């Protein structure tokens, strides 16, 4: 059965108030729509962990620093609702823009430190937009748990820190990246790739796995990175914005995985910006 689509905050709060009175836990899955199996895995995790589940769909203009990217972002509300129907979610919150950013809205949530590198450095203002809208969605839904994919690892860390710092009583649950058979991380942006582009994009993950394996065997990232960038270039990737080894908890740059670490990348292929990351096994002392 299809879940109700709610566009007004008052309607959302009426629903969640009833659930809370009944002592039911609420999970939220924030999305920008164009749902794929990665999103649906978050919905399944939320259903398993909470009594009630709200999926939010809002293409947030404040997190796009490129107007053309915003204009191209797919809007597929009816298809999204159809994909959610088998999961039995309790509400789909598709807020009208003025429910998020009413006239006179003047507040921005900014998280320093974690946002100074990688996505934050490449997309100025992006994470301020993310933190602001996610803070609003956390507060509007009153959810107990929020589900985010590890594909957007830096974003997941950002919203976790934001909720902690602002004393928002919610637990951020990270869920594994869902991948295509080729290893390509599922993303709404993938639908903009041609068939040939999808094939070439599938070469990103094997390059990352090879680097991770050699790091775990003791090689230094400084020695491996040039070859990895060359391999990505040969696959058709251009403008590799970052290819970094970072500490998993602080995003501090590393040369060897002497602590829990992630390998993270952002690069362009056929006019589409792709990001990915994987865990790297920690070296033994």
Curated annotation (Swiss-Prot):
Which EC class is the enzyme in? Answer: ligase
Q: Which Pfam families match?
A: Pantoate_ligase
Taxonomically, the superkingdom here is Bacteria
Main location, first listed in the record: cytoplasm
This protein's name: Pantothenate synthetase
Active site at which residues?
39
The free-text function statement in the UniProt record for this protein reads: Catalyzes the condensation of pantoate with beta-alanine in an ATP-dependent reaction via a pantoyl-adenylate intermediate.
Instruction: Tell me which species this is from.
Output: Ruegeria pomeroyi (strain ATCC 700808 / DSM 15171 / DSS-3)
Query: What pathway does the UniProt record associate with this protein?
Result: Cofactor biosynthesis; (R)-pantothenate biosynthesis; (R)-pantothenate from (R)-pantoate and beta-alanine: step 1/1
Q: Catalytic activity annotated for this protein?
A: (R)-pantoate + beta-alanine + ATP = (R)-pantothenate + AMP + diphosphate + H(+)
Record-listed beta-alanine binding positions:
63
